[in-house]
Each structure stands twice: as structure tokens, then as C-alpha cells.
Design a protein with these regions (language model features):
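Membrane-interface helix-boundary motifs at transmembrane edges
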Residues: 2-7
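A structural signal for short, hydrophobic/glycine-enriched beta-strand patches
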Residues: 14, 19-189
Length: 189
């Protein structure tokens, strides 16, 4: 009875993992999510501010080696750097603390500061929100820091897969922002 049921459940779980790992099903599921907010083309003529969501940084490795360590979502940082140059008058904000319970003293912001310095940008031009642990806190803690005014155009940079969630929480806190998705992972079908 029970042993047979457990074996059947284990077999089914293993089969599901294999299907997700070795077939294009994962990309097929990810693709519609990544397409919810299209890439900005053309870019707006004017932007008042740019918010970079955390998630591309590896604070533990940055701290250990003293140089910026990035993960596969590094495109968000390079996009932030490029947009900061394109819109030099825009206010710049990075939002991301740590979700790592073992390394609460390490912030993603330090990685961003080092990266921007290496890119020739002054990290002091950026406001840093370093307490958030999730997307909701990114929006809730960044809005009072950035103090956006009515009618201003703000871009929010994040991975294409997470930008729908980010847009939802930014709207929930009463901040109307424009999505700037990057770090696509699903192939174009």
C-alpha cells in the first residue's frame, strides 16, 4: 500500500523533473511570461529616473574577492549602465538588500558600486536601497527614497521573467513605472 504509493509518487516526480530538464517545456512556459512587457523600442526621449532591481549580484563572492561578481542576470547591470549614460539627467536608484539569512551583513549594493566604478560611472550618483529582501520590499522601500513626482517617467530594470511581478508590486504601492525587461532566457518560438 503505502510503499507502493510512495514509489509511484517518486517515479512521477522524477519523470516530471526529467521532462522539465531535458525538453523545451520550461522555455515554452517561460516564454509567455517574458513577453508580457515588451522591450522598449524605441527608447523614450526623456526619462526622469531609473530603478535597477537586485538579483544579478553575488555579494558573497564580491566580498570574498573584492571585485564585482555577477550571475547570469548581469544584463540588468549593463542595461542600467547604458541607460545612465543615455539619460544623464535621470535620477538613479538601485534596490536590493539580501535574501540570504546566513549573510545579512552583505548587500548587493556593494557589488553594484564596484561594477559602476569599473564602468566609469560615479557610484555616488546612485541612491541605494539596501534593506529589501523581495520584490514587494523593493517597491515599497524605494518609492520614499526616490520620491517620484506625478507625471514623471521612471524605468524599472529587471529580468523579463520577473518584470511582470515587479510591475504589479510597483503599481500596488502607487508608483506608475515603465518596464525595461532584460535577461531573457526563453528562446524565441
Amino acid at each position: 500500500g503505502r510503499a507502493r504509493g510512495a514509489q509511484w509518487l517518486l517515479g512521477l516526480s522524477s519523470a516530471c523533473l526529467l521532462v522539465l530538464q531535458f525538453t523545451p517545456l520550461t522555455e515554452a512556459l517561460l516564454y509567455p511570461l517574458e513577453q508580457r512587457f515588451p522591450r522598449l523600442d524605441p527608447l523614450p526621449a526623456h526619462v526622469d529616473g531609473i530603478v535597477l532591481l537586485g538579483g544579478a549580484q553575488r555579494p558573497v563572492m564580491t566580498h570574498a574577492y573584492g571585485q564585482p561578481s555577477l550571475n547570469a542576470a548581469a544584463e540588468s547591470l549593463t542595461s542600467f549602465s547604458a541607460l545612465a549614460r543615455r539619460y544623464p539627467q535621470a535620477r538613479l536608484v538601485f534596490t536590493g538588500g539580501t535574501g540570504d539569512p546566513l549573510n545579512q551583513h552583505l548587500s548587493e549594493a556593494e557589488t553594484v558600486r564596484l561594477f559602476l566604478r569599473e564602468q566609469g560611472l560615479d557610484p555616488a550618483q546612485v541612491l541605494y536601497e539596501e534593506r529589501s529582501r523581495n520584490t514587494y520590499e523593493n517597491a515599497a522601500l524605494t518609492k520614499p527614497l526616490a520620491r517620484p513626482k506625478a507625471g514623471e517617467r521612471w524605468l524599472v530594470i529587471g529580468s523579463a521573467a520577473s518584470i511582470p511581478r515587479a510591475m504589479g508590486v510597483f503599481r500596488k504601492v502607487g508608483w506608475n513605472v515603465t518596464a525595461y525587461p532584460c535577461d531573457y532566457n526563453a528562446n524565441h518560438w
